[in-house]
Amino acid sequence: MAPIKVGINGFGRIGRIVFRNAAQSCEVEVVAVNDPFIEPEYAAYMLKYDSTHGQFNGDIQTVEDGLVVNSRNVKFYNKRNPEEIPWAETGAEYIVESTGVFTTTEKAKAHLKGGAKKVIISAPSADAPMFVMGVNHKSYTTDLEVISNASCTTNCLAPLAKVINDEFTIIEGLMTTIHSYTATQKTVDGPSAKDWRGGRTAAQNIIPSSTGAAKAVGKVIPALNGKLTGMAMRVPTANVSVVDLTCRIEKSATYDEIKKAIKIAAGNELQGILSYTEDEIVSTDLIGNNHSSIFDAKAGISLNDNFVKLVAWYDNEWAYSRRVIDLISYIAGKDGSK
């Protein structure tokens, strides 16, 4: 069966990691990339060398109009506006919108003018339906033209929250993500008018920040709407983050019973999405881990049988990008494109 033809708009951090994940997949093929700020030679360099994930495992060459990656042609465009990108030239039907700019349905829909069939926003969206693999992906309907893969933190929290709510019913909860720094932060102190603390140097500080990830869980699990909220602590690590979910549960359960429920789910309906470990891991051990959520059984604690703190890790770059590929593969199957 022919692979699903994919285009990527925005060859930044997530765009490149999505490309790397696609290169490992037999179901999808990236046939076109658009980025107005870089040329093919520089794109090839950034794809080949990565300070966090190492060198690209494959062959990359540049040609006049793009790249040749593992003997496959990848057309490169430099258009600023989505409606100007001629996706139809390469047959790209599913577009990963990873600029971080066109995150509303109206803005992302502009890709359809160039021949795209569907758009997957690799960020939370104010109005596009959000899907988290393993949680609510089956609610996708083929009439949707623009969807969101939610955020990396929502992809970690939602599977864990789903298991706890399904088995024990969450009354309310608070989440903190201890999150590696990202491209929006500063290498040295600089101006950040809307978030003064966010303008401080990323490599020297623990920076309290806001996140909509916990509230977004209520959009993918309606039963939890209004029951979760959270915050972020941006920390001086380059990759891998960890979620701390502290919640009250209706059905009394010991910590061992909670661990057992998560372990069962990780080996069954959430296999490949949720992982369970009792190893003495630290963040760098999980660079390149494909799971959306890695439950750390030894890191959690409970105060009593109705109040518990749960800890789950995630590679906020790699695992999230892998879910983008998984989501494309799933919706293409529903659309009849594979």
Swiss-Prot record:
It catalyses: D-glyceraldehyde 3-phosphate + phosphate + NAD(+) = (2R)-3-phospho-glyceroyl phosphate + NADH + H(+). D-glyceraldehyde 3-phosphate binds at residues 151-153, 182, 211-212, 234. Gene3D superfamilies: Dihydrodipicolinate Reductase, domain 2, NAD(P)-binding Rossmann-like Domain. PROSITE patterns: GAPDH. GO terms for cellular component: cytosol. It is found in: Cytoplasm. Its main location: cytoplasm. It is an enzyme of class 1 (oxidoreductase). Pfam families: Gp_dh_C, Gp_dh_N. SUPFAM superfamilies: Glyceraldehyde-3-phosphate dehydrogenase-like, C-terminal domain, NAD(P)-binding Rossmann-fold domains. The active site is at 152 (nucleophile). NAD(+) binds at residues 13-14, 35, 80, 316. Keywords: Cytoplasm, Glycolysis, NAD, Oxidoreductase. Homotetramer. This is Glyceraldehyde-3-phosphate dehydrogenase. It comes from Blumeria hordei. The gene is GPD.
